[in-house]
Amino acid sequence: MDLYRLARPLLFRADPEDAHRRALGALAWAAEQLWAGWLDSVFGYPDPRLEVKLWGLSFANPLGLAAGFDKNAEAVGAWEHLGFGFAEVGTVTRHAQPGNPRPRLFRLPADQAAINRMGFNNDGADALALRLAGRRWGIPIGINLGKSKVTPLEQASDDYLYSFERLYHLGDYFVVNVSSPNTPGLRELQQADRLGEILARLQCANRESKPLLVKIAPDLGWDAVDAVVDLCGEHRLAGVIATNTTIARSGLRSDLQETGGLSGAPLRNRSTEVIGHIWGRTRGQLPIVGVGGIFSGEDAWEKIAHGASLLQVYTGWIYEGPWMVRRILASLATRLERSGFEHLQQATGCAFS
């Protein structure tokens, strides 16, 4: 019996951001307890067929926690015990910032979705560096980098570079986030000239060739997606994360009129479309992290089949609860058996073969 699903109606009565804060605090506490390892047997699904080796890193499974849930790495020690193969902290900016005024996070239960306009609220790169220093985890930890609101677009590369260098030895991989709709002008940084400057400066500072990725919006046209993909090749990026939240609102059942990025089930098909486009454009040579609307094993398999090497969840995890990871991984293992693949990595892009 999934206790979370029984309790969800009660949990969803609370303000979304307050509930988030309480959950993060509880997870941070649990991660420090002697019995934290016991959670592995409850929520984990160890299966060597699901292991992914990418960028010189080993992922016990392809399912990771997307950036945004644990912005300040407060509960970073918990994610490996909840079955995740990796986790991404942030978005972190050079300067600490409070984000946008509340309310700024909204649930859309009828659509299995959420709208957020958080605005990169975080403690800043220096604080994150202090929190991560001297600690090690059993899964790869990525760091998602954003631009401070006070920093002009013309100085964006300075902002990203500061955070990158400050956190360089503390992350297993890094993500350039230029696709959040909640920081004024940020999406302009997806333009080839602006993004190219950021990537060039980061790669010049990338002495140990840490995996560097870019996270793109689902609202880009195909020409713009292709331009970003070309930049990834030009600057030797390790991959792309597809996709961030959307500003589109088509097909929603909810009549909530709030600005911000929409995540969850309504994003599922578009993000998979973008993944498939990038896979086809690069003939599978650019690793893709697929995110957007993953609630089930079927959703996860679709993204892998369309070209994703790794996956991330956030909104689906809020709706489905902590047992979701185990259910998805078990479903992927079953799909492997039915599809005749010996290992999950063989299934990447199989929709096009």
Swiss-Prot record:
InterPro entries hit by this protein: Aldolase_TIM, DHO_dehydrogenase, Dihydroorotate_DH_1_2, Dihydroorotate_DH_2, Dihydroorotate_DH_cat, Dihydroorotate_DH_CS
GO molecular function: dihydroorotate dehydrogenase (quinone) activity; dihydroorotate dehydrogenase activity
Origin superkingdom: Bacteria
Membrane topology: Peripheral membrane protein
Binding site for substrate: 71, 116-120, 177, 182, 244-245
The keyword Oxidoreductase belongs to this UniProt entry's keyword annotation: yes
UniProt pathway: Pyrimidine metabolism; UMP biosynthesis via de novo pathway; orotate from (S)-dihydroorotate (quinone route): step 1/1
Keyword list, A-Z: Cell membrane, Flavoprotein, FMN, Membrane, Oxidoreductase, Pyrimidine biosynthesis
E.C. no: 1.3.5.2
Transmembrane segments: none
Compartment(s) of residence: Cell membrane
GO BP: any one term: 'de novo' pyrimidine nucleobase biosynthetic process
Known role: Catalyzes the conversion of dihydroorotate to orotate with quinone as electron acceptor.
Protein name: Dihydroorotate dehydrogenase (quinone)
Reactions catalysed according to its record: (S)-dihydroorotate + a quinone = orotate + a quinol
Family, similarity comment: Belongs to the dihydroorotate dehydrogenase family. Type 2 subfamily.
Pfam families documented for this protein: DHO_dh
Chain positions recorded as FMN binding sites: 67-71, 91, 144, 177, 215, 243, 264, 293, 314-315
Organism in which the protein naturally occurs: Gloeobacter violaceus (strain ATCC 29082 / PCC 7421)
Active site: residue positions: 180
A cellular component annotation (GO) from this entry: plasma membrane
